[in-house]
A protein has these predicted regions:
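Catalytic cores of RNA-modifying enzymes
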Residues: 1-153
Length: 153
């Protein structure tokens, strides 16, 4: 399944009865080079633990999981949980945290899930939380690098 192919995405979402939510700032990557380039730019390798925020259906998540020692993705939209279970089933180094990243204690999350690895953040950020989230991430001082895609509005 190609998570950047419109037909594959439509079939996947239809199987799970999913419809986009503008209120959640959802936008899914449909050009294959975008998740590949973002994942390459973050410099993840087997010694890296990646925190991803808002994985959506998982195109960036899969690219990260092919490179990193561990990928932890935080997703708020419970409708996407079964979608991610399907798209990430082949990646034992993937963990999904179900909930709101703005309610997470980032240093504790990094210690618990990414301990022993070089912690980085890599994400295609939901536009409705970009500024407050980046503020929290920088203030947490628990990531060695940040690589984010931000929507131009």
């Amino acid at each position: 399944m190609d998570l950047c192919n419109r037909n594959d995405i439509q079939a996947l979402l239809q199987r799970h009865g999913f419809h986009f939510s503008k209120a959640m700032g959802q936008n899914f990557l449909i050009q294959g080079w975008v998740p590949r380039d973002i994942a390459a730019a973050c410099g993840a390798d087997e010694h890296t633990g990646v925190l991803e925020i808002g994985p959506g259906i998982g195109p960036l998540t899969r690219e990260l999981a092919q490179r990193a020692g561990k990928v932890v993705s935080v997703e708020l939209d419970r409708r996407l949980y079964p979608v991610l279970e399907e798209t990430m089933a082949d990646f034992p180094n993937f963990t999904l945290i179900r909930g709101d990243v703005m309610q997470q204690e980032l240093p504790a999350l990094v210690r618990e899930h990414l301990g022993g690895l070089r912690p980085i953040l890599c994400a295609n950020l939901p536009y409705n939380i970009t500024t407050p989230l980046l503020t929290r991430v920088v203030e947490s001082r628990c990531f060695q690098s940040l690589t984010v895609l931000i929507q131009k509005e």
